[in-house]
Amino acid sequence: MKLEEAINIIKEEYPKYDLISVVDYDNYFVFSIVPPNYTIEQYGEWFGGLVAVNKLFKLTMHFIPLQHNPAAYAKAVENNTKYF
């Protein structure tokens, strides 16, 4: 699966949310998304959950790094993050 396809899947599942970043990690593209028109200045820090697209099954899921390999995910965040 290519990133563009994962972006389309996320936009279809969460059409009103804005994409902030994506991490290419293992079998997932892990997205950070926020509600529309969200600004830190107006609402403060956003602590919403991460949403991932499984590259193999092309399905979305809530992603919790601690349920995977936290050290490997942290390394992926350092090296494989793209911001929108």
PLM segments and residue spans:
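Extended interaction regions within the primary functional domain
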Residues: 34-36, 48, 63, 77
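Intrinsically disordered, low-complexity segments enriched in small/polar residues
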Residues: 12-15, 23-26, 71, 81
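Charged low-complexity stretches with an acidic bias
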Residues: 57-84
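Residue-level detector of alpha-helical hydrophobic segments embedded in or interacting with membranes
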Residues: 10, 30-31, 65
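Amphipathic, interaction-prone secondary-structure segments
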Residues: 19-46
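Alpha-helix capping and helix-coil boundary motifs
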Residues: 2-5, 39, 68
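A short, surface-exposed beta-strand/turn
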Residues: 41-63
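Short, non-transmembrane alpha-helical segments in secretory-pathway proteins
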Residues: 1-20
